[in-house]
Regions:
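Anion-binding alpha/beta catalytic cores of soluble intermediary-metabolism enzymes, centered on
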Residues: 2-259, 265-369
Length: 369
């Protein structure tokens, strides 16, 4: 018997866990607004993970007329999100929220109990608890993936959670050693490659003095293979991958460093023998111009800022942060907690475009498992 249109629609709308991030930052605001947007509800069934009280305060600040329904367990929330009854599922008038982290009273931000736009250990602990709960739900198969709002690394550490960031925490929780951070921009008038542009990083949250040591041939090949796999999931049959040089002017034949000759070029050759369409190393001052114009589908950056700065200049407000190599789907906004803008409401200039793109990307990945 053929499935009804409604049943097919539900299959196409995966359940996603949206973490609230650090409550002292913009996370609760962008989540409260994004979870009730029509484009979100048309593509997925969101469950927010964090403090219901903080979420209600954020919704009120942004004049989002919605009810926040609190749950003490993910199982409960998933059952309601999966219901055939439209009066209990997530909607523009109803946000499902699983309670995690330290308890906060109503109006904790307004009354100053929790400092808006400030580093606070309670904010770091709240972010940690929300992402751990969401990740476990994804590992257990309760949700199709998680979309994370930003945390603050110093607050994270003040709370005793000594991880460099989301990426490393999730890799540890999932028990994987081969993983990578990637930024992604979908196709539009600024990114001409038909399946968008991905930038993966060989090294990540490390001091510049450590990059050369960590930038091994094996690491380069692993990250290149990961971004190739991602772009294939996005519909690109044979991704064209460009690898960045490490030194200025591509090392100028060894005059400005020999990492291009001793490490990067041999890694590119190994990638080619493995069947990848890889080229490089290429000078960084032009590689991203060519990638933006559609010559490449993905770029492999050797270190954090080499990739982040270039991609964010192309499209910061719609970029998505994706963790590659995990057995679960994790996407995120590509910006931080924005303490300077947090809890000032719509007039602050806070944008939700990156969160909406992160939700859209997680939904697409969930459909291509």
């Amino acid at each position: 018997m053929a499935e009804s249109g409604d049943s097919q629609q539900e299959i196409a709308r995966p359940i996603l866990a949206l973490t609230m991030g650090d409550p002292c930052g913009v996370g609760p605001e962008i989540v409260a607004v994004s979870a009730t947007r029509a484009e979100t509800l048309a593509s997925c069934r969101p469950i927010v993970v964090g403090s219901p009280e903080i979420l209600r305060e954020a919704a009120a600040l942004w004049r989002v007329a919605t009810q926040v329904v609190a749950f003490d367990s993910m199982d409960e929330a998933v059952r309601q999100a999966s219901s055939d009854d439209p009066t209990v599922r997530p909607s523009s008038e109803r946000i499902l929220c699983v309670r995690t982290g330290p308890p906060f009273a109503e109006d904790s931000i307004r009354t100053g109990v929790l400092p808006a736009g400030k580093i606070d250990a309670r904010g770091g602990d709240a972010a940690f608890c929300s992402v751990c709960t969401a990740a476990q739900a994804a590992i257990d198969g309760l949700v199709a993936g998680l979309v994370t709002a930003p945390l603050h690394k110093e607050a994270f550490h003040l709370a005793g959670h000594l991880y460099p960031g989301h990426t490393e925490l999730l890799a540890q929780r999932c028990g994987v050693a081969d993983f990578a951070m990637m930024l992604y921009l979908g196709h539009d008038e600024t990114v001409r490659a038909p399946h968008g542009l991905a930038v993966v990083h060989v090294t990540l949250h490390t001091a510049m003095r450590n990059v050369v040591r960590e930038m091994t041939q094996s690491a380069i090949c692993e990250k290149t293979a990961l971004v190739d796999h991602f772009m294939r999931r996005m519909g690109c049959e044979r991704p064209r991958i460009a690898l960045c040089a490490f030194n200025c002017h591509n090392g100028e034949g060894g005059l400005f460093g020999d990492e291009e000759q001793t490490t990067i070029r041999p890694a590119v050759e190994r990638c080619v023998t493995q069947g990848l369409d890889a080229t490089g190393p290429l000078s960084v001052d032009t590689i991203f111009v060519h990638a933006r114009d559609g010559l490449y589908d993905a770029v492999v950056a050797m270190y954090h800022d080499q990739g982040h700065i270039a991609l964010k200049l192309i499209g910061m407000h719609r970029a998505v942060n994706i963790t590659l190599g995990l057995p679960i789907i994790r996407t995120s906004v590509a910006h931080g907690t924005a303490f300077d803008l947090a809890w000032r409401g719509p007039a602050s200039g806070v944008r939700i475009s990156s969160m909406l793109e992160a939700i859209r990307c997680a939904t697409k990945l969930a459909r291509t498992k």
